[in-house]
Amino acid sequence: MLGILMTLVVRHYATVRGFVAKPKSDRWHKRPTAMMGGVAIFLATIIMYALFVPPTRDSLALMGGSTFLFLVGLVDDTINIKPYQKLIGQLIGAAILVSFGLTLPITGYALVDIWITTFWIIGITNAINLLDNMDGLAAGISAIASIALGISFAVNGQMTELAFVAV
C-alpha cells in the first residue's frame, strides 16, 4: 500500500518537475512518461524497513547495501554512466552485503556462496533495470515477486516477513 501511495506522489512530482522519459526507439511508450518509479519503491521499502525491522548488524548492512545500489541506479538514470562504471558500483554494493556475511547459503562453501550471492545481486539489479523501458513493467514484475515471496512467507510461518511484504 505504501508503495502505491509513494508511486503516486513521486509520479506527480516527476511530472510537475519535468522528470519524464520522452518517447524514443528503445522505449515502448508513445508519450512522455514520468520517471523516478524506483525512488518511490526505494522510499517505501526503506520506510517500512525502518519502522518494522529491528536495527541489527544484518538489517543495517542490508539497508546500507541496498541504499548504495539505489544510488548507483539513480546516478545512472540521471547522468547515464558507462556500463563498466555501473558494474563497479554494483560490485561495491554487493561487496557491502557479503562483507557482512549476508550470502545465499546454497552450497555450504562460503567462497562459492559469496560468488553466487554477488552474481545474483548484480543479475537481479540489471534484470529490473532492463525491464524499466516500459511504464510500470518493472514495478509490476516487482509486485508479482513480492506476492510470491508473501505466499512463501505465509506457507513457512514467517509472519514478520509476510507483514513487511504486505505493506
How would you label these PLM feature ranges?
Residues 1-167:
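"…together with the soluble PPM/PP2C metallo-phosphatase catalytic core" -> "…together
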